[in-house]
Regions:
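Short, conserved phosphate/pyrophosphate- and ester-handling motifs at nucleotide-, phospho-/glycolipid
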Residues: 34, 117, 206
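Structural motif
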Residues: 108-110, 138, 200
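Ferredoxin-reductase
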Residues: 2-88, 145, 172-173
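Conserved S-adenosyl-L-methionine
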Residues: 130-137
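Histidine-anchored nucleotide/phosphate-binding helix
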Residues: 120-130
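A short, basic/flexible loop-to-alpha-helix module at the beginning of a structural domain
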Residues: 94-105
């Protein structure tokens, strides 16, 4: 873990309630794809966010939900915005977590995210493509409404870079014009795979979702030691 000051270079809206934040560290930092950072609002208030960028990039990208009802995220976003306006840096701790991508495995991969947990699998998916990993990779991204699929086109393009890559967006409450999968994202995985025994599975999303996913996937053959999510340490 590295503690470092970062300039807040960009805050832009991806949707009405989700923002992309770009931080530039004052010095080089190292982390593994799938790890997270903590934004230090104070010495006693540190808030974790998945790193959406890849380790070979010089900037740190975050995807932060800013809904007023979500004070945990909105307060962090307000701090970032304040520092950006004042042209002052923020303090972050980088390289935390144990759910990083296991590049030395030869198993096929399932990346599963709910909501802004997508930033976690976004980093891993791009790392996989950059390294030309030639294994089947299935990316499932679940959202409540289709307008929350803020990187849908980006991921469709990612899937076209390799015939073994697949991107499956899943919308919980779709409009009548939605053509894709519907319902709960973990159920889409269960419907698509008779057995999950052979897969490395990476999961990001709310703690409640992570618990449901772990239990359901193990029942369908997944090995707990081949399932990765930082939430698993707390549930």
């Amino acid at each position: 873990m590295t503690s470092i000051l970062c300039d807040v270079d960009l805050i832009e809206a991806l949707t009405p309630t989700i923002n992309r934040v770009v931080l530039t560290p004052k010095a080089p930092v190292s982390f593994q794809s799938g790890q997270y950072l903590q934004l230090c609002l104070s010495d006693s208030d540190k808030r974790p966010f998945s790193i959406a960028s890849t380790p070979n990039e010089s900037q740190l990208e975050l995807h932060i939900g800013g809904a007023v009802a979500d004070q945990y995220a909105s307060q962090a976003l307000a701090h970032l915005l304040q520092q950006h306006q004042l042209q002052q840096p923020v303090q972050v701790e980088v390289g935390l977590g144990n759910a990083q991508f296991r590049a030395d495995s030869d198993r096929p991969i399932i990346l599963l995210a709910g909501g802004t947990g997508f930033s976690y699998i976004y980093s891993i998916a791009r790392t996989i493509a950059h390294a030309n990993v030639d294994r089947p990779v299935f990316v499932y991204w679940g959202v409540r409404e289709e307008n929350a699929l803020y990187h849908n086109e980006v991921m469709q393009q990612w899937a076209h870079t390799n015939s073994k890559y697949r991107f499956i967006p899943v919308v919980q409450t779709p409009t009548v014009t939605w053509q894709g999968r519907t319902g709960m994202v973990h159920q889409a995985v269960l419907d698509d795979f008779v057995s999950l025994e052979a897969y490395d599975i990476y999961v990001a999303g709310p703690f409640a979702m992570a618990g449901v996913v772990r239990e359901a996937f193990i029942k369908q053959g997944a090995h707990q030691e081949q399932m990765y999510a930082d939430a698993f340490a707390y549930i």
